[in-house]
């Protein structure tokens, strides 16, 4: 399916391309801060296919994770000229690890072994709900991240998020999905309370209504323009098939914000956080 999507994009561009003098400016560059290039289960898309898709969508950078970490390594080690890859260690080998990583004695070794490669900038995405975040293995993971100046990419509910910061107040957390449906006023409270918290917006509900930014989220973005990131969350192949639509939806509401705010959320925040 992805191959057909890419072919359609290429054909449409060829047939509809205006003369060079009348060419429209490139769409706003985007950094995808929630990208999974999973190699389990198969099938998976080729490296060439996904790189072509990023290029077609003017996605110029990604926060890359995978299950297992082979996919992330493939993206990073390819060193594509037109894509900045920020690799994170995922504490999963197979999908069932989502439920058990926080109690699996092999998690610590998995993280430490991957970290020795020398290029990872964070750990995650990992899943936590409620008091499961109190597990000793979770605290070890948080402390490892702080000790090595790594970010944590946490798919966590409100309670688990607070526990992560209690484990170590020096933690730097990218909050996957921004709680899904956590009220905007509570999101604002967390941003005030935790200066090293950044909110990633894949699957986040309530941002728009009828294609228009809601007042609550407009205020939040304009008040904290340096604290938000975009993401696709390509956790299943269907998310790859709808990748272009996801990016178009982001650009749709970003266009309703002041240009400086839109650019911060689109890519400048990632540049500030992750560029080495």
Residue ranges and their predicted role:
Residues 29-33, 60-66, 86-90, 121-125, ...:
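Structural recognition of the beta-strand scaffold that forms the well-ordered cores
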